[in-house]
Amino acid sequence: MDDKVRMRFDHVSIAVRSIDRAVEFFSRYLPLKERNPKTRDDQVSGSFYWQDFWLGGFVLEFIEDLPGQPGFVTRFIEKHGEGMHHLSIEVNHLEPVVEKLRRDGMRVVDEQKFPSGSATAFISPRSSFGALIQFWQVPDFDNPHPKPAPDGLAHFDHVSLAVKDIRRAMDFFGRYFSPVAPGREPHLSHSEGNFILGNMQVAGFKLEFIQSPPGEVENDFVARFIQRYGEGMHHISLDLKDFDGTLERLKRDGVRVVDEKTNRRGERQFFISPRDAFGVLVQVWDGL
């Protein structure tokens, strides 16, 4: 990537039928802090509402279509169900990013420029291992949104992508994103043994990649996910201080909790089922 291009991971966007209902659910169990009020946006892909929240040092964005005006959010939900829609990365200069992607045969969609000097473009999930990725050129790149002071309640650790070929996926992100820092090399999961995982820091944020191991294994959840949905974003992962209290509230409220266990290293975790969490599989680890 051009040395003059700088990037910063900004948020993961979640497509929902109702922002208010989704925010009510996530706020009940996780320490969300509003970054932006619910706002209407008009882009080349259509008009919609969005709202941002801080969670453990990272940002969740919720998006919905305008009432009675089905658009790209509704089309996404009709095809995939509610859930993670795209990853968003801020850049100081968009044009060289798009030029390199197109030169290498990547599919770039929904380009748009705004009077403010901002601009946006997306890498089609067909080119980026099932993940729709937004680049957002911001004129005030050197003056990012101030983060709230750490509250010690949560740490947003990573987004996990299910892929067929983990090395090809990691090579792709290393080629088109910056800065990139190596993380854990692909290896058989020590805690489970039924999937391969690796991670890397991409534009200041950790991405995890998971892949089925060679041969047939019991409980190959990665293969099942890809068979049903295709490659793409699998889950979000966070460390939570009030692990026990949150788990108790979820169960008391009848929210489906799955894969609750302690791994071989003594680390406790559970997942909030996407059936109750607006299509998002949420992994929760004990402690910060």
Q: What is the meaning of each model-derived region?
A:
Residues 1-3, 53, 59-61, 95-152, ...:
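Vicinal oxygen chelate
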Residues 159-206:
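Aromatic-anchored, glycine/proline-accented short structural segments
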Residues 2-13, 20-54, 61-69:
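An N-terminus-focused feature that recognizes amino-terminal "leader" regions
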Residues 39-108:
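Ordered, small/hydrophobic-rich secondary-structure cores
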Residues 18-33, 95-104, 165-181, 246-253:
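Amphipathic alpha-helical segments
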Residues 30-41, 104-113, 177-188, 252-262:
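Short secondary-structure junctions
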Residues 1-23, 84-89, 138-170, 176, ...:
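N-terminal beta-strand motif that seeds the catalytic metal site of vicinal oxygen chelate
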Residues 37-41, 50, 62-64, 72-74, ...:
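Intrinsic, low-complexity N-terminal interaction/targeting segments
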